[in-house]
Amino acid sequence: MKKKLLAFALCTGAYAALFAYSVNSEQKTATSEMTDVSRLMPVKIKQTVKGQEEEMLIDTVKEANRKNIKISIAGAQHSMGGHTYYEDGIVLDMTGYNKILSLDQEKKTIRVQSGATWNDIQKYVNPYGLAVKVMQSQNIFTIGGSLSANAHGRDIRYGSLIDTVKSFRLLKADGMIITVTPKDDLFTAVIGGYGLFGVILDVTLELTDDELYVMKTEKMNYSTYSDYFSKHVKGNPDVRMHLARISTAKKGFLKDMYVTNYVLANHQDQLSSYSELKEDEYTGATKFALGLSRRYEWGRNWLWDTQQSYFLSQNGTEISRNNVMRSESKFLEYENNDNTDVLQEYFVPVKEYGSYIDDLRQTLSDEDLNLLNITIRYVQKNEKADLSYAKDDMFSLVLLINEGFSKEDQADTARIIRRMTDVAIKHGGSYYLPYMTYQTKAQMRQAYPKSEAFFQKKRTYDPDERFMNYFYQRYK
């Protein structure tokens, strides 16, 4: 029982990002229906092309130009909102384009094809004592997809993913391949650009040293969190990673919190004893517990109490950097004929957190939203990407929401999400773009003031809109 509770608590804390959906396809698959993990936007596509060789990708783009067919790009397909497919279009499935091309141990860089996952990189570099700088909490995402969303994670020292990219090669709409570096105009558009400028072929990323951390967890009230973070987390150079949770249970709703810091251990010479990479365990028990949380208020209360008790009991536990960045993921696979799980993510300036939570609580007090979980991370100010979400030092709040399939349920969830978005914008915040496109165009432009420049680049570099998805259709 103790092991099941342990696995359950670990798994339920991993909502940092984006859900999983895999396309079943051969090298080329004719017309079929495609959707994402939310199952809210099924459409008929013309063809899925599983890219394994560069020449095949080039030929596909040229053929699409000749026949005037739209192209969308899919990695592991974890985004929601139709970012990776388009009706009657070609989907390039990049998951087979996944080789590790080179590793420079001295410079701490790695070059990989875009269909490789973070798990592939971790397994390759772990024996050399190296680790990823910035990635999502889970390692199931492809590198190309992560660049396209400009991912972030638990690390609080290295910023967003864009800060760790040395260069990448891009297959453009005209069938030509170019190398893109930080000095190039396309660099800030492609990273965080959701596949709208071409096919990312391979990427050179900065790595860092694997390290041994000590887990330290404590409870607190939301009103003290901003000051606590500034003084004891950001202000302590030995804290390398950070994760927080705020209660969605009726008891302590949006008030009770606990935080987990990953602090540099004093005895780094013992890292090898902790460097074996962990894998998913006890998925069934975790899914069952989450099912209770979806259906019953007492289940949500129990979920919160169990998570909190477990992590508090782990004070002093030692863990490698690579293993911190391997949160469980299989439990996220959820199928039900009546409802589905969706994510929303809001970014709020650190100094605004307390008043933002008060306003969010007030907003939700008269709403019937099945809000299952909120995890919180830190993202330092970074406005390099054209669609940058971190206009200030921000807290990122990832909300897991269960919603029904009916048109009425979807419309109601969309309405509430727009209300929550207004709250974030009111406090100088923004929201993350890979999820359902429920926000209005006006909200998108408020949250992303450089969006018009981004769309102008799209019109300049891809005037025929060869690369297309529903995100672009919605907000262009």
UniProtKB/Swiss-Prot annotation:
Signal peptide: 1-25
Cofactor(s), names only, from the UniProt record: FAD
UniProt xrefs under InterPro entries: FAD-bd_PCMH (IPR016166), FAD-bd_PCMH-like_sf (IPR036318), FAD-bd_PCMH_sub2 (IPR016169), FAD-linked_Oxase-like_C (IPR016164), FAD_lactone_oxidase-like (IPR010031), Oxid_FAD_bind_N (IPR006094)
UniProt keyword terms in alphabetical order: FAD, Flavoprotein, Oxidoreductase, Signal
GO molecular function, one term: FAD binding
UniProt xrefs under SUPFAM superfamilies: FAD-binding/transporter-associated domain-like (SSF56176), FAD-linked oxidases, C-terminal domain (SSF55103)
Residue numbers of Pros-8alpha-FAD histidine PTMs: 78
Name recorded for this polypeptide: Uncharacterized FAD-linked oxidoreductase YitY
Lineage, uppermost ranks: Bacteria, Bacillati, Bacillota, Bacilli, Bacillales
